[in-house]
Amino acid sequence: MPERTGLKILDMISRGAKVIDLEHDRFPGMPAFDPVKPAMEYFLYRQHENSYSTSQEKRRSSSSGLIVMTDQSGTHLDALCHQAYDMKMFDGTPINSDVETPWGFKKHDSAEIPPIIRKGVLVDCTELLGDPLPENHEVTLKEFQSVIKQEGVSFGKEDVILLRTGYGKYWNDFSKYRNAAGVSGEVSKFLSDKCYAVGADNLAWDVPGKVDSDSGVIQPGHLHLIAKSGIYIMENLFLEELAKTRTYEFLFIALPLKMRGTTGTPIRPVAIL
């Protein structure tokens, strides 16, 4: 009987394969794109101090918390309902009251996103443009292709592309992180039929607020990739440890939460080398 792929992965890990965490920690006040603030709040509504009593025979106590968080914060994946073009999603689904409700979306929400287990490709633009890239720089298609050539990598329609700007190291310094470099519209348009998902170590994949001269919109990557092509975007990835390995092709795993109706979901992405 052929050995199953999952067991092969376990064998790889037992033999020393590296598992690299690509998620940032989450906390109240963490960096967030302005329209989705506050990103997260957390409260302990049950505390050990209030439930403990010396009169109890076993003296067990409990504590529980409440998380209040936007679905577009932290290390996350955009669902395909997150963007539309002329009030239609990538597959022509119209945005109307049957699809978009006050309680969430009925189609292309986060609950529909499958586990992502695919080849990952790191495009580390810092090797060409400096670490980190200049503030608010938009990676051009020429620069993107130069990095790919320099790394010697290839990718196809079923693969995941992770682009590093070097700003992930500033996760705890929002004054720097908010000015991270991003990806130009021409790169996103180029990738719109060439991959399964993309991600970057910044707030929005794109550079927030910059108008794309070709499409006339801000965040052109969200237009070309999600709204027009049905390609997932991941944001706020932590790529620093992966970059240190100088490994540009790897097994990528990200598990979205099955949250009905939501426009995005937290993920715990890892790279297995």
Give residue spans per PLM region.
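Active-/binding-site microenvironments in catalytic and ligand-binding cores
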Residues: 1-273
